[in-house]
């Protein structure tokens, strides 16, 4: 059962910083659908990408898996029985619900769900790694190191999907897309109070980068091919491929 997100519908005296606690986990499916434009498209396309990039005998990582939406989408399209998905999140509330959610659906692809820090979890023999709206919650100083580790753990020909909320160098365009995102949330039933309170809680926790900064980091990590494949307002997703020799 999906619970409606009304966490911020009444004034909160002391907001504090955002955490992925039990209250957020309970309403997360509704929250993200109503807050992130294009989220359903990205999830379904991640499933399609898994069908293309998964290789027998390899591992697929869903880093910052939340309740497992991307993991489920990938399991539906992977045809190799000996390909394993490893889903990782550091929130106990998210991981608990993710385990219950994943176990409710039968699939032939083995799936391991781990409560751990994505900055330190080993990445090995990977054909696909997914960071779906996760990097933006890491300290900026940790981001390049994580990408370097992902690149090292990917097999040649493997891919990284990196979905994020973006900031923009062009202030006019950035302001327009920011306003359009708020229009999107209003259209999905969020009040001005809800939008304002959630933004206040996120502003010290979710630190966004421009597409250009993301691409620069990916190139520095070693990815020979990196491009934006999806964008809706100030949300989007990049795909990066670890090149075969000579590519």
Swiss-Prot record:
Enzyme class: transferase
Keyword match S-adenosyl-L-methionine: yes
InterPro entries for the chain: CmoA (IPR005271), Methyltransf_25 (IPR041698), SAM-dependent_MTases_sf (IPR029063)
CDD domains (UniProt xref): AdoMet_MTases
Database matches in NCBIfam families: carboxy-S-adenosyl-L-methionine synthase CmoA, PRK15451.1
UniProt record similarity statement: Belongs to the class I-like SAM-binding methyltransferase superfamily. Cx-SAM synthase family.
Name assigned to this protein: Carboxy-S-adenosyl-L-methionine synthase
GN (gene name): cmoA
């Amino acid at each position: 059962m999906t619970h409606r997100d009304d966490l911020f519908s009444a004034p909160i005296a002391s907001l504090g910083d955002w955490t992925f606690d039990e209250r957020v986990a309970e309403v997360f499916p509704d929250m993200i659908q109503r807050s992130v434009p294009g989220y359903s498209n990205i999830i379904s396309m991640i499933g399609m990408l898994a069908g293309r990039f998964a290789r027998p005998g390899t591992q697929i990582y869903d880093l910052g898996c939340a309740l497992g939406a991307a993991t489920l989408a990938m399991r539906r399209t992977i045809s190799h029985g000996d390909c394993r998905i490893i889903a990782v999140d550091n929130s106990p509330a998210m991981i608990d619900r993710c385990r219950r959610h994943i176990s409710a659906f039968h699939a032939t692809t083995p799936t391991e769900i781990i409560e751990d820090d994505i900055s330190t979890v080993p990445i090995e023999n990977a054909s696909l790694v997914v960071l779906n709206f996760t990097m933006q919650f890491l300290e900026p100083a940790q981001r390049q190191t994580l990408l370097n580790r992902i690149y090292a753990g990917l097999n040649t020909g493997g891919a990284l999907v990196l979905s994020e909320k973006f900031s923009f160098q062009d202030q006019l365009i950035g302001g327009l897309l920011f306003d359009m995102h708020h229009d999107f949330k209003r259209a999905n039933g969020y009040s001005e109070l809800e939008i304002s309170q959630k933004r206040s809680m996120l502003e010290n926790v979710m630190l966004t980068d421009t597409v250009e900064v993301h691409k620069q980091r990916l190139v520095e990590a070693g990815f020979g091919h990196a491009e934006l494949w999806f964008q809706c307002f100030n949300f989007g997703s990049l795909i990066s491929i670890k090149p075969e020799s000579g590519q």
